Amino acid sequence: MRVLHVCSELFPLLKTGGLADVIGALPAAQLAEGADVRIILPAFPDLRRGIPETVLVREIDTFAGRVALRYGHYRGIGIYLIDAPALYDRAGSPYHDASLYAYSDNYLRFALLGWMACELACGLDGYWRPEVVHAHDWHAGLTCAYLAARGRPARSVFTVHNLAYQGLFSADHLSELHLPAEFFQIYGLEFYGQISYLKAGLFFADHVTTVSPTYAKEITQPAFGYGMEGLLQALARQGRLTGILNGVDSDIWDPQSDTLLPTRYDAENLQAKAINKTHLQTAMGLQLAENKPIFAVVSRLTVQKGLDLVLEALPELLALGGQLVVLGSGDATLQEAFLAAAAEHSGQVGVQIGYHEAFSHRIIAGSDVILVPSRFEPCGLTQLYGLKYGTLPLVRHTGGLADTVVDCALENLADGSASGFVFNECEAQALVKAIRRAFVLWSRPKHWRHVQRHAMRLDFGWQLAAVDYLSLYRRL
């Protein structure tokens, strides 16, 4: 089966979020299952540098000007790059300028991505033509609309990684996008008078997926649907909405082989994990104390991630004898609050603003608990990394967090299924109660080790998702 993934990021060459991790791992897992998989992306500078050897497939005239499609390989996967320097050759983020303002021509930049994917489905590359086109998030949403406009030359799947980002643009641009005028309606890509690239993907795809079973249910409700819940309810009734859990790339995230760690370890050698803890405490200026559990945050610092709750719960966490490590960036108010906490609680709170992939590995390996108290979380990867590294996740019961972490309630400890700590209400007091339960388990090292080992043996590899996606493609 020939599959084309349409997206805007690819780990490790270009990453702004979890989408890049998915595209860096899922195609390879599908290839291992026998699929013929390729990816199409805009030729952003980081991607051009990372894939320097490419050949010209075709040059064509488009609504965005003359465009070259180039082809190369990265880690065994075929990669198409859309070479349009006027649109894509910009330093920094693929979505916004240095002042964090979205590029004014994003409507054109990402429409071209969908257009070129559709052209491949129509035979642009005479040597390869996809049977299934799999578009990811709003950046690729118009892919499904272009395929529908061209008579559906390939089957289409659209994956929602985060429904909150909808790709909304002025209806004035419709004439520039070479889409049928009749597509701009409620039963189409119109959303409150604007063009929604996300809705285009949802409405015109043959099948819609999202990145966990629970999130697939949640987004059919007003609290999580961002105005799309009616359409998503209809898709669910038609059997066209599926949740498939993301996985962990074990080539990158595995404490047995992770070269970014001071000391590698596994479930049978957890003493070596303590060495990583000492290194982390030293690096973050924390008191060296093996008996103090380290709670870690590796995240965008936003209210959506529930990190305001962490600040509210911090006094209790410290009073109980814990330490806090934070790596991330985002909301300026939250950044300042965490930095102030580090200054006030020197030796017990360490904060690093920014994101460093290598250091994120060291934090997850060196910590005892990874905090993911999100208000909503489509899937979440951080808690999966925590499980893999024996760093017990403390999460809110939402989205993929609900699907992957089993609370250390007595009955779950008794039957051996417990893998972390879960709270329900989106309130600081609920988080505090979960933190207290973590300390209770911490005070019983034998039970803590038992939960750690169980968590580390859970299988959240990408092969499971790859098989599920390929099975879905065959049913279309």
UniProtKB/Swiss-Prot annotation:
Q: Tell me, which GO biological process terms does this entry list?
A: glycogen biosynthetic process
Q: What class of enzyme is it?
A: transferase
Name the UniProt key words of this record, in alphabetical order. Answer: Glycogen biosynthesis, Glycosyltransferase, Transferase
Q: Which GO terms describe its molecular function?
A: alpha-1,4-glucan glucosyltransferase (ADP-glucose donor) activity; alpha-1,4-glucan glucosyltransferase (UDP-glucose donor) activity
- Report residues binding ADP-alpha-D-glucose: K15
User: Which pathway does the database say it acts in?
Assistant: Glycan biosynthesis; glycogen biosynthesis
Entry keyword Hydrolase: no
InterPro entries (alphabetical): Glyco_trans_1 (IPR001296), GS/SS (IPR011835), Starch_synth_cat_dom (IPR013534)
Q: Name one GO cellular component term.
A: cytosol
* UniProt EC number: 2.4.1.21
- Tell me the Pfam families matching this sequence: Glyco_transf_5, Glycos_transf_1
Oxidoreductase among keywords:
no
Report which superkingdom the organism of origin falls in. Bacteria
Instruction: Report the catalytic activity.
Output: [(1->4)-alpha-D-glucosyl](n) + ADP-alpha-D-glucose = [(1->4)-alpha-D-glucosyl](n+1) + ADP + H(+)
Q: Which NCBIfam families match?
A: glgA, PRK00654.1-2
Family affiliation: Belongs to the glycosyltransferase 1 family. Bacterial/plant glycogen synthase subfamily.
What the protein does?
Synthesizes alpha-1,4-glucan chains using ADP-glucose.
Kindly provide the name given to this protein in its UniProt entry.
Answer: Glycogen synthase
Question: Which organism was this protein described from?
Answer: Yersinia pestis
